Amino acid sequence: MAQKDVLTDLTKVRNIGIMAHIDAGKTTTTERILYYTGISYKIGEVHDGAATMDWMEQEQERGITITSAATTCFWNDNQINIIDTPGHVDFTVEVERSLRVLDGAVAVFDGKEGVEPQSEQVWRQADKYEVPRICFVNKMDKIGADFYFSVRTMQERLGANVIPIQLPVGSEGDFEGVVDLVEMKAKVWSTEAKLGEKYDVVGIPTDLQEKAEEYRTNLLETVAETDEALLEKYFSGEELTVAEIKGAIRKLTISSEAYPVLCGSAFKNKGVQPMLDAVIDYLPSPLDVPAAIGHVPGKEDEEIVRKPSTDEPLSALAFKVATHPFFGKLTYVRVYSGKVDSGSQVINATKGKKERLGKLFQMHSNKENPVETASAGHIYAVIGLKDTTTGDTLADPNNQIVLESMTFPDPVIEVAIEPKTKSDQEKLSLSIQKLAEEDPTFKVHLDSETGQTVIGGMGELHLDILVDRMRREFKVEANVGKPQVAYKETIRRVVETVEYTHKKQTGGSGQFAKVIIKLEPFSGENGATYEFENKVTGGRIPREYIPSVEAGARDAMQYGVLAGYPLVNLKVTLLDGAYHDVDSSEIAFKIAGSQVLKKAAAQAQPVILEPIMAVEVTTPEDYMGDVIGDLHSRRGQIQAMKERAGTRVVRAHVPLSEMFGYVGDLRSKTQGRANYSMVFNSYSEVPANVSKEIIAKATGE
């Protein structure tokens, strides 16, 4: 095993992801890959599925998905690191972060359904990061499975240039194997072969010969066009060698000009080994992908390039943080350049903090395999990093670099959460800290008015899952409020002078303060939302009381005059006032400052602001009218419409309050074929009729 810890020859390494729609059979495919790649050093341990079973049991026992972040396995002296990608809309964060560290991917499709909405969305995200892919049409043994239909949906729905390099032998219950169009041989799994470990290479069945010739001709024409010499050879009637064909397919795949398509049935153990061969033959090694680009810490315009070599200085990206039952915090990193030993000190260049690497592991299908050194091109799990979170760069302290991070949007939806008992309060704090480390899109703050803890996330499902994890993993008993939109208030008019006198006369010394202010709308630079200016002359208000007036005004801004939402974008100018030698005090001026601001704001035409989301809907042309009509009914403003690879993309600005439950409505309107993403865009004034409703709700009228 020792020589297999880390392969130093990077041409033999593949960092891949397996991406799929929820039910396309991703887990089974991953499981079978681990099973076959494990055979080489597990012979005798495998009793009809024992390997698969113990692997799942261990998952249940430990409560973590071992496949979740990165699993290392070996195939014909090559090393494959598999990074798992989830298949759900609200977890785009998970998908984005795994795609960021992949070099290539296997897209798994359901042989009966072809391209499904989720596969469409994950495919588009992979386009964004330009990840080379091969396609595996799975479940060929299913009733209704149709390889040719699946290939057609890839062309039509994904607009992808796909090239079948295999055809199925038999279908549904009679699915036996595949025709390899590169070698022009059939690979057939007989029912006797234990768990599909062996297959026979035979001649192509007569009923498939004509079809195989037709598809082979298409393949050869595509391949020949990649290279002048091949083109000449092909048209002069010479046979292209297997090595030449594979080399050309590899070139097309790595440049994302084409996507090879294979087929099989992971569940029935057919077609998995040729798919592993294709991963090695066609997907890029760390040396085939562009060098990592970053910048000098604090100077974003000074670019640095790091090649995937152990001779370069260290650069690594943390792409996931997970909690392990025995080791505590595990940070998964992709090393882009250089090498580093366990126990070394490195710098978190993103945060400017020193970190010490504790133990280093490579996750081998079902056990942690400790390694001494982490080197370029590989993926590791690290213990002992304290300040490092998702998206941070670890670098050599003497040669710092910040790699391009992943961008995570701010939360747009919030719920208040209230622990039931004192001990739950402590558990809640711990769970929030742990979840925030793992998930960069999960945010928390304390509502000063109600004293409640408010958590924010990317969508309703996202928050449901987070709350569920608090209950299950951290045993927090808590009451959870309804999702809320974060409104704000501001003013539209200048009020030249407003005065307020605070007087209180009880026995002994009283309280006295008089202030006069001007209030006006304000839009500061760099997002400043407030300004205070003092124009009092001649000591009409002693200097020591001025800060109290400002403090009072700022307090009053926490709760607006219409519905109690925070006031933003205003400028307060203190013009004049009066004081009393005996009765004036800091507290008197603070109260006066607070009251005068409320009085002025009420006269300055106050309005409510709401968060507006930039929404992007990707939909097939047939549903375009329904989608646009629906966005209009949600007070949406259409910004742009574009065509992208056979689908339509609609961009619109829509108030967040109108987007609750949108995912369900969109699915039912488009039979699940459209999907959407939304990010916060800006705050904007609420129309009068909506404003009335918000005020009525807030004031309980």
From Swiss-Prot:
Keywords assigned: Cytoplasm, Elongation factor, GTP-binding, Nucleotide-binding, Protein biosynthesis
Is Transferase found in the keyword set? Answer: no
What GO biological process terms does the UniProt entry carry, in alphabetical order? ribosome disassembly
This protein's superkingdom? Bacteria
What would be an example GO MF term here?
GTPase activity
Pfam families found in the cross-reference section: EFG_C (PF00679), EFG_III (PF14492), EFG_IV (PF03764), GTP_EFTU (PF00009), GTP_EFTU_D2 (PF03144)
Q: Where in the cell is it found?
A: Cytoplasm
Q: Which residues take part in binding GTP?
A: 20-27, 84-88, 138-141
GO CC annotations, alphabetized: cytoplasm
Q: Which residues form the tr-type G domain?
A: 11-287
Please name the InterPro entries in this protein's record: EFG_II, EFG_III, EFG_III/V, EFG_IV, EFG_V, EFG_V-like, EFTu-like_2, G_TR_CS
**Similarity-based family:** Belongs to the TRAFAC class translation factor GTPase superfamily. Classic translation factor GTPase family. EF-G/EF-2 subfamily.
Q: Which HAMAP family match?
A: EF_G_EF_2_B (MF_00054_B)
Q: What does this protein do?
A: Catalyzes the GTP-dependent ribosomal translocation step during translation elongation. During this step, the ribosome changes from the pre-translocational (PRE) to the post-translocational (POST) state as the newly formed A-site-bound peptidyl-tRNA and P-site-bound deacylated tRNA move to the P and E sites, respectively. Catalyzes the coordinated movement of the two tRNA molecules, the mRNA and conformational changes in the ribosome.
**Annotated protein name in UniProt:** Elongation factor G
In its UniProt entry, the species of origin is given as Mycobacterium leprae (strain TN)
